[in-house]
Every structure is written in C-alpha cells, then in structure tokens.
C-alpha cells in the first residue's frame, strides 16, 4: 500500500471511529462460520466503498481475523486481500460492473491451479448503514448503493445503526478443482456474488412499504372483499357505501403502520432497557433463519407465548440478527393508548379473540394476511393464542395457521416456511398475576395503568433465551401429506377442502413439538425443579449441587433433542447465579447452608419448572419405577412406560414416536447407570441405596403428573359410562381436593386444559370405546400400575372418592417390597 493511501485511510478512519458503531452478524463469525484465521482469507465486498472497507477492518481486528488492508503474498505473488464486486456509483453516474474483480478472481484461481496445497477462503461481507426499505411509488430503488455524498450522510446519521454481515465462506480450492480456473469461472463467481449480496440486502431491509390508504384501496378492490361487502350490505340492509365504510373501519382496526424510524428508535430504547434489566439475551440457531430469508422464503415465526415482553424481544433479536422485524399478530386487548399506536408502528396488526358471526371481519383479516404474504413481509403469530399461565405449552389455536394455508391456496405466494421459536426467561414479569388468575382471579384488562405498574417491577430479570427451532416448509409438508393440495387453489374464494382441518391440526402439533425441542435449560428452571422435588422445598447446598449435576449430565449425555440448549456452566456457577436472582432464601448454620424455596414463591417457581418438565419427564419416570420396584427388568419397564407414554406425549408435546421409545429408554437407563443412580445387572435394573437421594428427587418430577392420570383413570374405572364433560369436571374437583389435602402447590395440577387433553388421548388410545364407555379392564390395568407408584395416603384419598367397594376389591397390584428408610433430603421442614 502506498504512503499516500495509508495517510488517506488514517484520516478517513478518525471520523469513522467516532460515528460508526457497527454490530457483527453472526456475533462470533470464527466459530459459527467455521473460519480458519490461520489460512488466507479473501474478503469480498459488494461495491467500492472505503467507509465500508475501514468498518470491516475494525471488526476483523476485533475478531482476530486477518487485516483486509494487508495484501496476501502467495508463491511470490502479492495480491489484495479484499475485492469489490462493483466499482460503485459516482456522484454523476450510476455504477457499472468493475472488471478488476473478475481479473482478481482469475488470478487467485490461477494460483490454485499451480499450487495444489493452496486453499484460500473467499469470505463475502456486506456492510450496511441503515435499514430503511423505502416507500412504494418513490422513484429511488431501496436496493441502491450509495455514491460518496450519500455515503457521507449515511455514516453521519446511521453510523450507529450499521452492521457487518459475514457469510459462509467459499473454498477457492473446491471451485478450482470442481469447475476449473478459466476466466468464465471467474465471471461466474462475480455474478453469483452480486446475486448473493442483492438477496442478502433484501432479507435485511425487506420489501418497500405501501402507503396505508393505497393498501386499503387494493384490499377493497379484491374479489373476496367485494363479495363480503355486498353480503354485508344485503344481510344488514344497509347501503353499499356504508358496508364499504365498515370494511375500511375494520382495516383501520387491523392493519399495521410499520415505520423504520420507529423501529430504529425502539432499538435504541430496547438496547438500553435489555442491558439494564437482563444479564444477557442468548440466541441460538439464528443462522438457519437468515439462510431462509436469503433463499427467498416467506417466513412465518411461530413462537411460544410466555409474556407481553415476547413481542419486543423477538423483534429486537431479529433486527440484531440482520433480519427484517416481522408483522406481528397481537391481541386486540393491546390496542390501547399509548401502546397500540406504538406497537402498530413497530409492525403489530391486531386480531380479535373470535371471528364467529362476523363474515366481513374474517374476510378482511384473511385478505390482509394474504396480502402480507404476497408482498413478501415476514409474519409472526403466537400459535397458542395467548400467554401460558402455567409455563407449559398450551393447546394450539389453529385459526391463524389455517388462514396461512388458505393464503397459499390463493396462489402466487413465495414458499412459506414456519419457524418455531422457544422463548424463555429466568423471570417473567407477569408470573404473580398468572398465579392469581389460576386461583380464580378475573384477568385484568390491559391498560396504561397496568402497563406502568408492570414497568415498575422490571428489575433483575436474569437472562433471556430465544432458540430458533427446526423450520417447517409448508410446501414440502403439503406435497408429502396432501399431494393433491394444489387442486384447491382459488384466488377469490377462501377454500376449506376436507384435508385442511386434519392437516392444520397435525401442523400445529408439529410446531409445538419443535418449540419444545428447542427448549433452553437455565439456572432458574433447574434450581426450581430440584427444590420443588423436595417435599420441604429445601435442600442443603451440597444436595442441591448434586441434583443440578445429575440434571446437567442427563441433558448433556442423553440430550432430549439436537436443538435443546443446556448451560455450559458448572452447578456451582448456576446456583450462585440463581441465588443472585433473590428468589430463594439461604439459612446458615454450623453445618452449612440450606437453600429454601419460600412458601409464597413455591407456586411461582412451578412456572419455571414447567418450562423444562418435558426434558426430564422420561428419566423421572424410569427413576420412579425403579424406586418402587427396587428390581425390574428392562422389558417390564418398557411395557409399563409404554402404557402411559401416549398421555405424556400428548400433554407435553414430546417428540419420540412409539417406535423410538425403546431406544430412548435404553439411552436414558445407560446414563442413569453411568451416574450410579441405578445398577444395571444386564437383564435387570436394581436400586442403588447409596445414591437414593438424587434418584428420589429425580423421581419426584413425574409424581404429580401420575397422580393426575390416576385420578381420571380411577373415575373411569369406577363409572365406565361417565360422559366426557362430567369426567373432566370430576377429575378437576378431585385434583383440587388432593392438592389441598396433600400440599400440592402446582396450579396446572387441576388445570381444565390438561384434563381435556388427557381424556381426548384416552379416547384415541382405545381406553374409551366409540359408544363413550370406558373399557374397564384396560383402565384398571393402568390405574393399578399408577397407584402402586403413589404413597398410600394419596392412593386412599383418590379411592375414597372414586372407587366403589366392589372395584376396591379388585386384585391388588403386587405388594410394595420393603424399602430401606429413605428420609427426605435434609432441609428446613414446613411449619
């Protein structure tokens, strides 16, 4: 590099250091993209911009990557370590292809031809200042590159809203070996790079935004809304103009009013907020979503719903991953001042709880959603329909998902891909309200006062987690499961073919399973699981650390799913972090520390335990079986677990099929044996008295679930002809009674939805016949197996209410073998 150029770069770097604060995507490019800093890297940028080059250089030095300003010297030949695909625009002329890039690619390919050991990494990098998509009808294309004057103002105003996006490398060795080294390959490389950068920019910026009134005019002109307006005028006996005005009013109520400036401002506010409230936001598998966006997919984000914070957190995360914040389906209850107008500008569109009896509303909403897909906007909706009050996934509401498929049946949309997302927190600000609502309190309507009260509670929120699950391409799904789906395409009428409902139900279930597959274990939910497993809600520090280690080893050595994330910290680090959250009490004595979960916190902590209950349910069930039997064969264990697995699978959205269950249980058994929680004697599994305490705590994780199943099965066995409504109601009443008598502090224990799912599963599995009567022989077999795993007191409470005298005289389960006295782990007892 010449001396003058060095001086020029140094002078240019001074204002850039002050004005530019760019974000790197991905956050750790070396590990996430598999870069090898020891091998030569050729940086490829879209067009000639010294500001972009110096911004890239600053990030490369921060990431310990080679300096793009230092040339590469290979086999005595010195070549630049960066290349611009285009020359870039000048103030008075638009850009033209820069042939130097083709020549440089050709020179590098030639070096590979002459040196078989050489393998240069070609690393595409784009630097963006600002993310405004622009408005439709404006003459300047939003994908334009900037000339020198425009770049100056972009850096001045948007230097702190910039990012450096590293892409996956291309091996020049592979290119040379597979495609040759002549000039046509160099031309092809340059052409592919141009397409890559164009797609990448579109994925980051999104399509142009329409003027709101222009959008309404287009919707009004659609055949479906024209027909709905005519029907509205006829059915309500009003004029066509009045019916049309009703449609416009509904559009005003529904439609977002997306503003890039609002997003940019909210990013500043949220960055400040997250940094003060949270100790970190952990994001996993975002690269798969970036790739989908770059490949031109229409993305529908379907996260679980824990808190009102979800809306803001997910948009914030996506924005910082270099993606366009989505249009978000929000409940109409959030459309209050000032939140409603703010959310609208951040991309929210509002949806009523029910569409029943309002054909015009359902048509307008469906057409608006279809228009979002047609224009290429990403969309987000919560498939559960509302926030989970228990910490578990709710049964999915399929209305919006059904409309998504109906949008495909209009024809003409890009490929739609559903992206399940797990959102987790170490502290949910509404958890106290949830507990009150589950105890019968009436849900407060959202308003400004409630929002301000909630903001007052925002402190010490620990860590947040956003895990992107395995994407579900709709076209691929329909091609596999409904090959004839294209026969139903109709651009005017909303179609409801016979296959739609079963397909939507299956898709919804798959989404929930994939959300659970991407669950995040953390300090709070692991500590809550251990302490709630102790009847006294307290453990010594040593016992709690031992139990945390048991959970961590299970999750690491026998992982639930490839997308599940487990903390990489030690049990000591996790416990110290949890104690800093001020949810637990520590009582010190001369022997050591006792960690206590206070009574008033116990119900709240079940929320966090329930977030990961599905990860530990099968190990807990194995532990429970071994605890009771003391000695059991693998075959017998598999048989017993297989009887109740369909209920667990439906309730907790587990991903193992019946065919996968034996292998899964073997893997878990091997891990429990490795931890010496049980002894594997080949054909038999035997209790290990020396490790009974952690086994006992592990077994407690499934205790309440089995008791709930026993309640319903005992009622079915006692009254085989009981109808579904009565069965669910009686089960809930008995569960409430059991929770009072035996101190069960879990609100979901008598949750209506849980019993509804259980009864539906019993019918599907053949425990209830087509006539509606229970098959007593089957229900008694499962009940006897379950009741044997419960304490005599709990069993007596259930049977005293549900089982008639003659049923109680049925042959009993084998008598519980004597077990050594295994006192509860030491800790503070309840007063």
Curated annotation (Swiss-Prot):
Its main location: membrane. It is a peripheral membrane protein. InterPro entries: GPAT/DHAPAT, GPAT/DHAPAT_C, GPAT/DHAPAT_LPLAT, GPAT_PlsB, Plipid/glycerol_acylTrfase. GO terms for biological process: CDP-diacylglycerol biosynthetic process; fatty acid metabolic process. Keywords: Acyltransferase, Cell inner membrane, Cell membrane, Lipid biosynthesis, Lipid metabolism, Membrane, Phospholipid biosynthesis, Phospholipid metabolism, Transferase. It comes from the Bacteria. One of its GO terms (molecular function) is glycerol-3-phosphate O-acyltransferase activity. SMART domains: PlsC. One of its GO terms (cellular component) is plasma membrane. Its EC number is 2.3.1.15. Residues 801-831 are annotated as: Disordered. It holds the Pfam family Acyltransferase. Pathway: Phospholipid metabolism; CDP-diacylglycerol biosynthesis; CDP-diacylglycerol from sn-glycerol 3-phosphate: step 1/3. It is found in: Cell inner membrane. HAMAP family: Glyc3P_acyltrans. Belongs to the GPAT/DAPAT family. The HXXXXD motif is essential for acyltransferase activity and may constitute the binding site for the phosphate moiety of the glycerol-3-phosphate. This is Glycerol-3-phosphate acyltransferase. The gene is plsB.
């Amino acid at each position: 590099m010449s001396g003058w150029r060095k001086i020029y770069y140094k002078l240019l770097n001074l204002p850039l250091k002050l004005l530019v604060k760019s974000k790197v995507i991905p956050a750790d490019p070396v590990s996430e993209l598999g870069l090898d800093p020891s091998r030569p890297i050729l940086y490829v940028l879209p067009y000639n911009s010294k500001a972009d080059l110096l911004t890239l250089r600053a990030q490369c030095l921060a990431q310990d990557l080679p300096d793009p300003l230092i040339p590469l010297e290979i086999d005595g030949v010195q070549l630049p370590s960066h290349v611009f695909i285009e020359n870039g625009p000048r103030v008075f002329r638009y850009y033209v292809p820069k042939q130097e890039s083709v020549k440089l690619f050709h020179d590098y390919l030639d070096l590979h031809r002459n040196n078989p050991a050489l393998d240069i990494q070609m690393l595409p990098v784009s630097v963006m200042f600002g993310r405004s998509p622009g408005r439709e009808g404006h003459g300047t294309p939003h994908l334009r590159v900037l000339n020198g004057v425009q770049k100056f103002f972009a850096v001045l105003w948007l230097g702190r809203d910039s990012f450096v996006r590293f892409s996956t490398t291309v091996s020049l060795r592979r290119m040379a070996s597979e495609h040759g080294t002549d000039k046509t390959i160099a031309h092809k490389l340059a052409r592919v790079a141009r397409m890559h950068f164009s797609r990448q920019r579109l994925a980051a910026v999104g399509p142009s935004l329409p003027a709101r009134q222009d959008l309404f005019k287009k919707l009004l002109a659609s055949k479906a809304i024209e027909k709905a307006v005519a029907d509205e005028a006829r059915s309500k006996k009003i004029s066509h103009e009045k019916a049309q005005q009703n449609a416009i009013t509904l559009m005003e109520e529904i439609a977002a009013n997306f503003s890039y400036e609002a997003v940019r401002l909210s990013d500043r506010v949220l960055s400040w907020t997250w940094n003060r409230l949270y100790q970190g936001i952990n994001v996993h598998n975002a690269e798969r979503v970036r790739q989908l966006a770059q490949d031109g997919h229409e993305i529908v984000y379907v996260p679980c719903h824990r808190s009102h914070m979800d809306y803001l957190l997910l948009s914030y995360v996506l924005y910082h991953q270099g993606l366009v914040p989505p249009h978000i389906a929000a409940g109409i209850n959030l459309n209050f001042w000032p939140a409603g107008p703010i959310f609208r500008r951040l991309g929210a569109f509002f949806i009523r709880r029910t569409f029943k009896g309002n054909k015009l509303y359902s048509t307008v909403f469906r057409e608006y959603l279809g228009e979002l897909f047609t224009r290429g906007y990403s969309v987000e909706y919560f498939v559960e329909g509302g926030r989970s009050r228990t910490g578990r996934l709710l049964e999915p509401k399929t209305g919006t998902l059904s409309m998504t498929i109906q949008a495909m049946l209009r024809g003409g949309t890009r490929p739609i891909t559903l992206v399940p997302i797990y959102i987790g927190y170490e502290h949910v600000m509404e958890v106290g309200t949830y507990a009150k609502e589950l105890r019968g309190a009436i849900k407060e309507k959202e308003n400004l006062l409630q929002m301000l009260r909630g903001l007052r509670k925002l402190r010490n929120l620990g860590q947040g987690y956003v895990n992107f699950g395995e994407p579900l391409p709709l076209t691929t799904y329909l091609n596999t499961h409904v090959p004839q789906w294209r026969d139903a395409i109709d651009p005017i009428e909303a179609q409801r073919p016979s296959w739609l409902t079963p397909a939507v139900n299956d898709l919804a279930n798959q989404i929930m399973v994939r959300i659970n597959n991407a669950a995040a274990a953390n300090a709070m939910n692991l500590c809550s699981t251990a302490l709630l497993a102790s009847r006294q809600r307290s453990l010594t520090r040593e016992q709690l650390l031992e139990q945390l280690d048991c959970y961590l080893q299970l999750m690491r050595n026998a992982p639930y799913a490839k997308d599940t994330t487990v903390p990489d910290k030690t049990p000591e680090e996790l416990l110290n972090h949890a104690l800093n959250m001020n949810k637990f009490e520590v009582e010190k004595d001369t022997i050591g520390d006792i960690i206590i979960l206070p009574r008033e916190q116990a119900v709240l902590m079940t929320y966090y335990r329930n977030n990961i209950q599905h990860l530990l349910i099968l190990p807990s069930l194995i532990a429970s079986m071994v605890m009771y039997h003391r000695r059991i064969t693998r075959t017998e264990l598999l048989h017993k677990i297989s009887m109740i697995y369909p209920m667990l699978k439906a309730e907790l959205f587990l991903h193992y099929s019946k065919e996968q269950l034996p292998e899964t249980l073997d893997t878990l058994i091997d891990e429990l044996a490795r931890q010496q929680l049980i002894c594997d004697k080949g054909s038999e599994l035997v209790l290990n008295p020396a490790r009974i305490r952690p086994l006992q705590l592990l077994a407690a994780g499934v205790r309440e679930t089995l008791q709930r199943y026993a309640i319903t099965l005992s009622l079915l066995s006692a009254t085989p002809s009981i109808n579904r409504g009565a069965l669910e109601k009686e089960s809930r009443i008995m569960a409430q009674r059991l929770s009072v008598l035996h101190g069960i502090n879990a609100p979901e224990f008598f949750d209506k939805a849980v019993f509804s799912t259980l009864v539906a599963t019993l019918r599907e599995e053949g425990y209830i016949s087509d006539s509606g009567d229970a098959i007593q022989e089957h229900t008694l077999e499962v009940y006897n197996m379950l009741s044997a795993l419960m304490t005599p007191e709990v069993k007596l409470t259930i049977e005293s209410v549900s089982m008639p005298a003659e049923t109680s005289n049925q042959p009993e389960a084998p008598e519980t073998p004597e077990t050594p006295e295994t006192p509860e782990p030491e800790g503070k007892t309840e007063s």
